[in-house]
Amino acid sequence: MRRRLPLFAAVALLAAWPAAAQPILTHLADGNDWKRSSIEQQRAYLAGVSNMISVGAAWDAKNLPGSEQTFSRTAQRGLKHTDLEEAVRVVDGWYRANPTQLNKPILSVVWREIAKPQFPPAK
């Protein structure tokens, strides 16, 4: 029995090894997802993004006190004057105006169409 346990453990590890070696594929929600979603789901998605940015900015403030140029802090500044309904309208309008770009992630649209225009152009 003692000889079988190490053999079983070795077989189990070898069986799991290929699964661990596979890359993790991440799907970022895009325009196709946006178009299929109800208004409530769209609001929930954007509220989740807002919460993620707020938590990230709070973490940055605590752990990186001198660094104002983190993604979360920058995004928070760029989005602070936009409410949820306006964000839904902007994202919805962008995908309506760009039907061939439904594969563009929603986060990219939020950044480029809402947050980034709040900053002066880079020199």
Predicted segments with their positions:
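Short, hydrophobic/amphipathic alpha-helical patches that form generic packing surfaces
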Residues: 44-55, 112
